[in-house]
Amino acid sequence: MLSQKFSPRRSGRHVTGSFESSFRFLREEDADVLRIRRGSMSPEPENKEKWLKMSYEAEKTCLLAPQESQTPCVCHTANEKYEIPGMGDDSVLEMLSYSKFSDLETWLCMPSTLLPRSRDSVCSLPPPSHENGTADTDRESRPPENTSINLSQCQERKTHLLPPSSLMPVSASPTSSTPLRTTSTPLPKPNRDSGQGGVSVRKRRRLAASPGGLHWDASGSVLRDHDRGETPSLSEVKRFPRSVDSESLVPELWRDRAPLRKTISIDDRLLQQTPREHHRLLSRLERGKKKLRNINSLGATGRYETHKKSESRISRLAQRLNQRQSDAALIKDFRPLFLLSGSAGSSQSLDRNFSISMSQQMQNLQLTQSKKGAGPASPSAAKRLYRNLSEKFKGSHSSFEDAYFFGRSDRIRKVSNIQSSEALFEAVEQQDLDAVQILLFQYTADELDLNTPNSEGLTPLDISIMTNNVPIAKLLLKAGGKESPHFVSLESRDAHLSALVQEAQRRASELSNQVMRESLSLETSDKEKQLKAWEWRCKLYKRMRTGFEHARQPEAPLMVRLSVTGSTTLTVSFQEPASMNSAVVTKYKVEWSCLKDFSLLAGELILENLQSLKCTITGLTMGRQYYVQVSAYNMKGWGPAQLSQPPSAVPSNWKDCDGRESRRRGHIEAMERLLQQVRATHQHYCCGDTSKLQNPSRKQSVSRSLKHLFHSSTKFVKSLKRGVYIASVFYHKDSLLVTNEDQIPIVEVDDSYSSSLMQDFLWFTKLSCMWEDVRWLRQSLAVSTSSSSTLQSRQKMLAAAGQLQNLLGTHNLGRVHYEPIKDRHGNVLLVTVREMDSLYSFFNGKWMQVSKLQSQRKSLSTPEEPYALDILLITIQDILAYQRRSQHRLSSGLYLGYLKLSSSVDQIKVLVPQRMPNMLCHTKIRDNWNVSRDEWEWLQSLSGPVEVERADQATGCLLFSELQTAIKSLLHQINLPLHQAKHFRLYTHEVLELGHNVSFLLLLPASDDVCSAPGQTNPYTPHSGFLNLPLQMFELVHFCSYKEKFISLYCRLSSVLDLDALITQQAFREAITDSEVSTAKQRHQHILDYIQQLDEMWREVRWITNALQYARYKQPLGWVPITWLVDVSVEPPVQKNDSTSSNTDYVPTPSPSPEMRRRKPTIESQPGSDEEGCSEVFLPTDSDYDSSDALSPRDLDLVYSSAQDLSHQAVHVLSGSAPDVLQMHDLKYSVCSKSILETESCTKDLEDLSLSSYSVKTTDKPSRSKFLADAPTKRKLLSKSHPQRSYFGGPHRWLRVQSESHTPSLSEGIYTRQSDIDLPLETPLSIPHSPTTSYSLDEYRQPYRESKPNVRRIFVESCSKTSPCRDAPHWEEEEEKGSRGATASGARPGYSSTSEAQDVDSDEQTNEQVSEILSSTL
């Protein structure tokens, strides 16, 4: 039943009666309609008056019905319409749904005359189609839009086409130039006592029947006007013939959408319709059927949908403004029946009339709304507020693009600011700390209007401090919150709070009286809400007033420290008071004076930004003494002042003692002038010699034409044969840039290299600071076949760099890695590394994961002889880590650095930490980087222990205690006890001001130990995490981090002048005539003068050479012994314990090449170097430079580290840079027994093994060849025992042999396995031991964890001999007799375990001992 469809709970009799009365009314008016048509749309006066009278009465019934009647009016007065429950949060259509309009029920429910049906068809509707379920769901899922837009569109629109319906109001209107409209009443409100209809519909909330042109589809969804924007004109519908076919066709046509039309128009062809027009309508409806479903809705949600109420005042205000506009549009819409404008015989199109009458602004609003995506059916109040305000703020735009793109960000920001500011006030009032944190995190202080008072004259900080909410107040203070400017005094604050309390009480009293009087009206619920809100606000204001009355002034700040930070600046740091006396401190005052009693202030500073409790006083007079004090402030006023510690200070700097200037002053300007002179010289000499620059390139192209005959373009190198290459590593996070052949971009420099490779490499590193000038250098460089080999090799480097730039499409190739990579095939790889901000698309490259690239490369590599490219991929993680860490800078402060060098054949290396390779080993002294004049004079005056005692008693010099702490920390970092550092010195010639407010004091070793020569013994072994970096590379990365502009200019000048010196020298040699000789000599002299000027500037800035000069002096010149600062007798001397595998250089250093360096002798192990026995562990070198001088960061680590660190290292090493090809299984000899070869030799570790309770004295270390059948050759140490695992074998014994199930860190040493490792230390037990079986002491380490110190992890291997007994005495005897004991090398100082020297000659070392060294390296 149709009546049951719209009102399922209404009885059918009442609806049927309404239909019959509607039919009677329509038949009476039918003759008038025909007369209007015959009279060319000129109505008769009586009929016109009759229609207008009926429309006027209907409008009067809507507008003037009293509130007390059973049918409340649609539009209330200004005071009444806001009192409807939920009106503040619901839309206008929900307000309209409260109206019944029972007086217009008959007119609304009259049957349609357009498509007459039988009585049965009038009272029934077809069931809802399943095809439109998706469309209905989409329509309901769309977010409800602004109701004002919908109503405004209803006001401006013309007639819409409606499908045939059994309930269709008919209104004939005469022709008029001004169109009129009418709005019919909804269906009567359903009665709950009535039965349900027979049609089954989906259970979903629907909008009640209400005026405004709403339509319903078969499933109960509301159809908005704009959903029918492309429907055909009304005249086409009116021309349906009255036949039986219409009864069957129309229900099928409108099965998806059964609308209810409330306003229609009719023209002269109301009762005439032809079959042609019928079919045109059907075809047009079928074409637009899907299009109608996809248009976004502009209507409002139903009254039964639940909405989240907004408690915000600004939200309610915005909605009321929106309601006023909607009501105004609605009132304008209640007019007499509208008449269509146009000539007779033409139907008015919806699109034509709508586009004419709708303003440009409304078009933009409609387009903007139609672009919005689907959202929840019931948005929150914040979202509705956002939509309402965004449309009001948008204004008029010329086009949709302007409205949507250009104005959208401003509107969103403005609306967001209003919402966030209001939300912040509510969160502070409700004491919601989480909400305040979220708002402060998402918005800035300006966006929140953090310091803008609200209507009550309060800021969020005022509310938080007067309610004594300390956490929220501190958050607001850190965000930059301030108090209200209205509170100029205590009296004004008190009066303001009292006024707020009185106002809240008055409003609460008035609302209470209104609620009592109007307890039965509709306004009661809203009044009660307002009453509760004002009562709560009254309590809030009373609490704020009570908090203000009980608060007191704050106490003095704590820990006020005064420091000298420059020649004209002082810095004060402090902490907040211990007790704030029930009030949060909002600001501090810093005062300084030249008088101790502060009777005359030199200045003061108010600190309101409390993010950092630190203040810097600038503009002071150098050399004048200043006293400083600090006081705190809260809402009750200023508290007492606190003097600083020390109470006074003199602005000064350490350079004020002798008047020296800074190292970097004026050097940058001088280098810029020198660079301009060099460029001018190049232009002068290159202008006349252009022909010489073209001939070599032409000859080169001819000579290389045959080689590149079948190569159309230059490409990357796929495989290394022999020569020098440049590899460019571009990375982003864990991805590398590779070529289309999945290779790292590599180009060839030359097919061979000379003995000056190291000098060429250093020049290439300088070239990395001027990649953009490569083309200019190539053009100005004229190289002939008679040129020197150095000049030719550098010209080839320039050509290769330019080629790589062209292939990659970028000038910047990155920084050069600190050493080249070499292999046994005669290849040298120069690596440049650059970090990319994103995965930038390259024309000749793509991005690939590092792990994937390594796994692909391992299948192609040669197991016996790894190439330089293989070594690059193996150590790629270390290279990238070095690149990242070398760009980090230290924070501002004063540091204590440790200067230690080691020399090799052709270079000097500096000890640096791996975590920061651009700086010496260091520890922080303090945050203040400046050293004052008084502190520097105190350091210079130290001349003996008497001075130390005097300085120790003096409380004024804080630098003394800071230096003591820093020295102990640095010595502990390098694993050196105090008694062994008694010869160390403090460098006092200068304070190294490195830049970026970072300064250094240097700690120097003894004069003989400053630089360790090759073969020199190591007095101590530092902790892991250090590397030896070449001095030139250290200076490059150091200055690139701290003096970027200086090093860039220096590298430009140095690289250009080096080339110019070679060119002018070659020209001078080739000169024949006197004029040529004179010109060449003059030019060469100019270049030499430039080089001399550059070297002078470089020496002034190069601080490390000056420090080395003073460090080698044995006389106390420029340094102070640390024994005058630190008492070395505090720690008793302890003898350290070493092992044979700790006989390495000073520290392990990383290297991209997997080569093992020579075993250096130590005092306790070997008296001489093992040149013959260790010759096989080196890769042969073709020049005097060998990359094996600097080992990999995964090198020997013989000092203690925790189990967590070791396990982390193991995971990182084996899963990071090294692919699976590097993870070996076993270490076996090919001449061993078959059982040994077939059985895997597992490697176990002993963690936290303590040997302090024993006296380990190993006088002889028997070789493992005693239990081997035959000692193998030195070149056959690794065996391919596992057929499924590929690895590098042969002489490359730097690969760590690992078990597949056990993967410890590669940086840990491997030792001779004990025969009975599983033996407990208390209970004797003897068990047979297999040569291929190993055991661990892990189960017995827990009882001794607390009583015995920790020793680093030790690897043990099995042996053929078993211990006869496992009790502790026999074990000690075995250890004393020299049986296979595990020597705990690198034990921490203070342990009682010792070891005597082992005199093992190089010839007596067996292959098994060599394998220990090899397996302990990377």
From Swiss-Prot:
Residues 119-236, 1134-1179, 1321-1343, 1361-1418 are annotated as: Disordered. GO terms for cellular component: spindle. Disruption phenotype: Inactivation of ankfn1 produces vestibular defects in fish larvae. Residues 223-236 have a biased composition (Basic and acidic residues). Keywords: ANK repeat, Repeat. Residues 144-154, 1136-1146, 1407-1418 have a biased composition (Polar residues). The keyword Transmembrane helix does not apply. CDD domains: FN3. Residues 893-900 are annotated as: Highly conserved peptide sequence. Coiled coil: none annotated. ANK repeats lie at residues 419-450, 456-485. This is Ankyrin repeat and fibronectin type-III domain-containing protein 1.
